[in-house]
Amino acid sequence: AAMGIEHINLAIAPALGPDGEAYLEAVQRQGWVITAGMMNYDYEDYSTLDTIKTTGGIAPDAHWPASGEAFAKAAQITARLGATAILMHVGFLDHADAAYAKKFYDRVRYLGDAAGEAGVTLLMETGQESAEDLQRFVETLKHPNVMLNFDPANLILYNKDEPLSAFRRLAPWVRHIHIKDALRTTTP
C-alpha cells in the first residue's frame, strides 16, 4: 500500500509451501484488496506453445489428483484472504479428443465444486482456445462456480482470437480481467 498499490491479483501457490504462513502474514500486512487469487503449478512449462499445451493446468495425468487437491486448498486460502474468486489456466481445451474432453470436463467440474465449497468462484483464464471453443465449454459445463478471467493479451500471444470480438462473445461469463501488452506470435 505504501507504493499506492491497493488492489492485487495474488499468487496463492506460495501459500501452499513450507513458508506459506509467513507468505500470508506478509501479504496481510500490506492491507491490499485481493481481487482474486491465482493458482499455478510448478510443473507448468510456458517456454513454448507446445510445452504449455501438454503441461498446463490440470490436464497432465501425472499430476492429477494432486493438482486438484492443491487447487482446493488454494481456494480455501483465497476465501480466507477475503477474495471471491480464484483464477488459473486450467489447461488446453480439446473437444476433438472425446476421452480427453470428458476427463477435462470432469476435472474442471471438480475444481468448480471445490471453489464453491470454499465460497469462491473459479475463473478460467482465456488463452489457448478460441472464444468460440471456450464459450462451448462453459455452456456445456454449466457450472455455477466456473466463470472466466478475460486476458486479451493471451488471445494475442497464442494467436487464438481478436480480443474485442472474443470479449463480446464471452462477456456473460467474464468476472475479472487481466490487462497487459502482447505481440501476436509469428510461430504458432
Label every model-predicted segment.
Residues 12-15, 41, 90, 174, ...:
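Residues that line or immediately flank small-molecule/substrate-binding pockets and catalytic motifs
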Residues 1-14, 74-77, 81-82:
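Catalytic domains of carbohydrate-active enzymes, especially glycoside hydrolases
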Residues 7-8, 37, 105-188:
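Acidic/histidine-rich catalytic cores of soluble enzymes
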Residues 45-148:
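Active-site acidic/histidine proton-transfer and metal-coordination neighborhood
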Residues 1-2, 19-23, 63-77, 159-168:
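Short, acidic/polar
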